[in-house]
């Protein structure tokens, strides 16, 4: 895929600029998976999501093994509108690598940021707000308790951010290879299209289509599919698949785990990551927490916006 296809991708999806709103009484965390849900945290909500990861990688071609420690973080804040969220997300990783080439193994260490991204997400289509306002169908039990075709229509958001990569970073691709900028710090764009379906029975399905670092010599194209199930009000489990395509790194990753909602503003979680290749093979365990400071005061509804909303207020 090249820059022309990337531009076409953005042009195809940007026109869907509808209005909606979202706020939940309970914490709305992206953890413990890697995907971004379509919904923002809500206006005047400040949320922190962070975790620790411990894992091992083994690369058969390079004949080395890596013991890794990772710290990931996300700071999210709902500002101006219910649909709008600004965030700082990133991950710092420290590797202890043992190389088995030659007659005697030797060990070395490397550490840096795998990512450090400042961005904005906007929820531009939310079919669930209309469903909530309409209320249940008082004439049909079946309509309220069985699958409906409209359940396939997801909420949709768009994220645009900037990656801030440090110089001489072994964990990120060089911005422009074979030039004086090869080992310099760089800023590159990241775009994410997110969809979210909230289905009956406590199932939530999230998809992400990601275009990352397209101005560098190693652009990354990926997708994430996340299925979450909440059997109770306080406990959830998830499975996730992530596909990554890049000259720097390509893989198929699989995650699974659980989260426990301690109270409406605090969540703890744990997850496992693995893949099925040997260049490298990866196995990671992660634990994390999410906490929000809820300063939200009032919801903005679709009916409150535009000409009809102003007319209703005058009446």
Where is each model-derived feature located?
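Bacterial Sec-dependent N-terminal signal peptides
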Residues: 1-27
């Amino acid at each position: 895929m090249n820059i022309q296809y990337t531009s076409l991708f953005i042009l195809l999806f940007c026109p869907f600029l509808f209005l909606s709103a979202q706020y939940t009484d309970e914490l709305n965390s992206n953890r413990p998976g890697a995907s971004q849900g379509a919904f923002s945290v809500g206006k005047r909500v400040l949320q922190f999501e962070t975790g620790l990861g411990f894992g091992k990688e083994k690369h058969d071609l390079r004949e080395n093994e890596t013991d890794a420690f990772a710290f990931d973080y996300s700071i999210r804040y709902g500002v101006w509108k219910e649909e709008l969220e600004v965030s700082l997300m990133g991950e710092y990783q420290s590797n202890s690598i043992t190389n088995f080439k030659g007659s005697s193994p030797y060990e070395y260490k490397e550490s840096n940021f795998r990512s450090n991204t400042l961005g904005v997400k906007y929820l531009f289509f939310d079919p669930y707000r209309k469903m909530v306002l309409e209320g249940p169908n008082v004439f049909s039990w079946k309509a309220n308790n069985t699958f409906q075709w409209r359940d396939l229509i997801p909420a949709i958001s768009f994220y645009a951010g900037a990656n801030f990569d440090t110089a001489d970073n072994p964990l990120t691709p060089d911005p422009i290879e074979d030039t004086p900028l090869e080992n310099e710090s760089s800023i590159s764009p990241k775009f994410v299209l997110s969809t979210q379906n909230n289905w009956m029975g406590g199932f939530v399905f999230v998809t992400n289509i990601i275009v990352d670092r397209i101005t560098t010599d190693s652009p990354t194209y990926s997708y994430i599919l996340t299925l979450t199930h909440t059997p109770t009000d306080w406990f959830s489990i998830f499975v996730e698949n992530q596909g990554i395509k890049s000259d720097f790194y390509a893989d198929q990753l699989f995650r699974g785990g659980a989260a426990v909602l301690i109270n409406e503003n605090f969540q703890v979680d744990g997850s496992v990551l693995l893949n099925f290749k040997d260049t490298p093979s990866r196995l990671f365990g992660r634990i994390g927490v999410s906490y929000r400071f809820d300063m939200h005061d009032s919801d903005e509804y679709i009916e409150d916006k535009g000409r009809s909303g102003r007319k209703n207020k005058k009446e």
